[in-house]
Amino acid sequence: MGEMTAIRDAYGAALKELGEQDVRIVGLEADVASSTKSGIFGSAFPERYFNVGISELNMVAMAAGLARTGFIPFVNTFAVFLTTRGADPVQSLIAYDSLNVKLCGAYCGLSDSYDGASHQAITD
């Protein structure tokens, strides 16, 4: 049996690898680069990586705009904030127009017990 790897470490490495293969891939994150490991991509491609701060709604809207101009955005945040704060623009700006945006929610369900109830995605 091979060595076990944390999902977030595998995700960060895979995102970096995808970025090496396609210059259209951009990363957006809500001040969670170390938690989601999306910062691995950001370190490799700082010109294609945007930390928007704790602003999921705006991050999703930015991703929609980037997708409309030919980029392939990967949106990175905790699942609970993506499915609550980011829900409206996901529906109205991305889903209705079938835009090519990748929504990556880390720590789904009760998996983030350390950070408490505010970070537990029981509605995702």
Residue ranges of predicted features:
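Thiamine diphosphate
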Residues: 1-124
